[in-house]
Structures are given as C-alpha cells and as structure tokens.
C-alpha cells in the first residue's frame, strides 16, 4: 500500500479527497489519483514495519482487523467466506471492511462485519494498533484459482470445505426493497415470466456484444412472450424500438440505487448476463441465472453458486483473463477485441443457443 498527500481537493462523488491530508491507498489506485490531480500529489511508500499486518497464525482476539478491498460489488461479496472464517477463528475481534462507499451495502450484509469504512481512508483515522489485511490483487494475480479461494490465499488462511463456503456466500436484500421490486416497472404478474437481463459488465471485454444482446432480448420478448427487464448503470441503455410482442422495460431509467438494483433480481424468474455482479448476486440469492462467459473461466466466479448455469466460449484468444484497468487498458493489446471493441469469442455465442437454454432453465 501507499500514502498519498494531495495539493488540491478531489470532489469525485465516489472518492472525494481533502487537500493536505494523508490517505492510505492501494498501489493500483495511485495512477487514478495522479490523473485526478494532474500529478499534484506526493506519493510515499510504506514499509511493512509501519503497519501491523494481518497474520493468521497469531491470536487476534480483541484486536480491530481492517480488511481493505477497492474492487466492485462482486469482489466484496466474494470476501464473505473469508470474513466469516476470520470471525470464527477470532470471535472477539472487531472486523471492519474498508471499501468504496457505493458498496457499503454489500459489506454490511455480511453477518461477521462489525463496521464499514470508506476507501480511501485518512491515515489519521486509522485506529491505533489496528491489524490490516490488504486484499489488493488477491483475485487479479491468480487467474487459475476461484475468486473466493484467492481471498483465503491472500490472507494466508486455509480454505474451509465447499459447503461452509456456500453457506457464507449468501446475500439477503432488505424486505422493503424486495416488495418494491415486485411493483416496478409494473406490478409483477404471477402468470408472466420476468427475466432480468444485465446488458453489460463493468468491463467491455466481458460484455456480451451489443448486436447479440439485441437479438437475444428480441427473442426473449417476441418468441418467448416474456417480460424482459434491462439492467445496468443509470441511464446507460437507450431502447430504439421494442419487439412487437412481449414486454421490454428499461430499468436503468427507474432511478434505482445499487442496493435496490440487487434487490430487484429477487422479482425475476431468471437472470441472464455476462460475467458480472448480476450473475454473482443472483447466485448469492439462490435465483436461477444464466451466465455468458469467454474472457474468464466461468467456474472462477460462479463455482459455489448452485443456481447458476454458464456458457463458456473458447477460442484462440479466450479465456484471456484480461483485467481492465489504467495499466492494462480496456482490451488486451494486439487482439481482435482491441480493434472491434468487443470480445470476438463471446460474439460467437449464438443468441438462439442462449434463448433455448433459457427455455430449458425455465422448464418451457
């Protein structure tokens, strides 16, 4: 990890930072803040002896353990089994998760978490003698190991048995949000199948190509006669024209929060999408889901979810295990996707195959 000191304020809504104040950040985040401040920041390396680092082989009861992870909602979800195991081993410890504020609702859903802090954290706000577990790169550096298992590896802890992990990988939405989910965009019709379709992943390399998605949604609505609810970031989808039959609703226009969007999945009979949070949370809530994979191996993300079935496309350049970030870019260099702006191997997954599998999962 590193310390950064800013000369100017960052007012970014996700990570607002004050000037003349030291923050503790992940190494990979330094470039982000450098861009945000036009280079007006001081970066300081941290020696291991400056921090009280997590060691699983010593007694951490009555200690405050802070677990750092600046990943997305799914990354926080994949931490649940590790957090539960830490609490089982050290029942009297105080367990804190430090993550992006948008995903606090995920961390607080884990029964073992006592407190949540926003990332990045001010150095002066670190509790005295706290124990730090940094999970930066835990998943990204281990492309042959399931994401959940990577968390244990990074913490230096043995992985519990699969059944124990499955019991931890559970997300429980608020009852009020679930009730509201059945009322939007229209009241859920018990005689009509509702499909939640996540239009894209956070990284374009993992997204099912636009043309394929359009064909699939049309088939689901027109041929299947289903209610199809399009999921994604707020205002990220524009519908040009709807199929003549069926019902297609653009949920990105509903003004839902992240937490409400996850709860909305509970109103769906089936969730379809690429390697993304929609598939992961559907699995964590026991909802039937159909994942569309190519850049990453399906079982690295969904192997502990019994309700999820996945297509795995393979080709000369897939799985490529490409993690999109400031350093790596959106797509692997010198590959077809870097020119076309989409995963060409995932594009070979015919929407008709996905449609037929959806019918099978729905017992139609």
Could you describe each region identified by the protein language model?
Residues 1-364:
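Catalytic machinery of carbohydrate-active enzymes
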């Amino acid at each position: 990890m590193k310390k950064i000191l800013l000369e100017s304020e960052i007012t970014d809504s996700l990570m607002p930072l004050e000037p003349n104040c030291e923050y503790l950040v992940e190494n990979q985040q330094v470039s982000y803040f450098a861009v945000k401040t036009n280079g007006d920041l001081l970066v300081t390396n941290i020696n291991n002896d400056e921090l009280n680092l997590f060691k699983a082989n010593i007694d951490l009861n009555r200690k405050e353990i802070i677990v750092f992870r600046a990943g997305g909602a799914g990354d926080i979800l994949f931490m649940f089994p590790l957090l539960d195991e830490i609490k089982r081993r050290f029942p009297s410890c105080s367990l804190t998760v430090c993550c992006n504020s948008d995903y606090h609702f995920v961390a607080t859903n884990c029964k073992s978490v006592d407190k949540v802090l926003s990332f990045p954290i001010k150095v002066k706000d670190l509790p005295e003698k706290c124990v730090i577990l940094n999970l930066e790169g835990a998943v990204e550096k281990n492309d042959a190991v399931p994401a959940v298992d990577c968390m244990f590896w990074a913490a230096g802890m043995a992985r519990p048995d699969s059944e124990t992990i499955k019991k931890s990988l559970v997300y429980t939405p608020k009852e009020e949000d679930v009730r509201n989910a059945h009322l939007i965009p229209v009241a859920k019709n018990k005689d009509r199948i509702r499909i939640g379709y996540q239009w894209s992943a956070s990284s374009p390399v993992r997204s099912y190509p636009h043309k394929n998605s359009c064909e699939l949604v049309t088939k689901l609505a027109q041929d299947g006669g289903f209610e199809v609810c399009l999921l994604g970031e707020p205002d990220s989808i524009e519908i040009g024209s709807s199929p003549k039959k069926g019902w297609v609703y653009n949920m990105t226009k509903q003004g839902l929060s992240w937490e409400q969007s996850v709860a909305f999945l509970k109103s769906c009979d089936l969730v379809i999408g690429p390697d993304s949070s929609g598939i992961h949370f559907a699995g964590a809530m026991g909802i039937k889901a159909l994942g569309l994979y190519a850049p990453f191996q399906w079982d690295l993300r969904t192997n502990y979810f019994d309700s999820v079935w996945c297509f795995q496309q393979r080709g000369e350049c897939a799985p490529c295990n490409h993690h999109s970030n400031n350093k790596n870019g959106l797509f692997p260099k010198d590959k077809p996707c870097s020119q076309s702006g989409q995963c060409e191997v995932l594009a070979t997954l015919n929407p008709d195959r996905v449609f037929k599998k959806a019918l099978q999962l729905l017992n139609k």
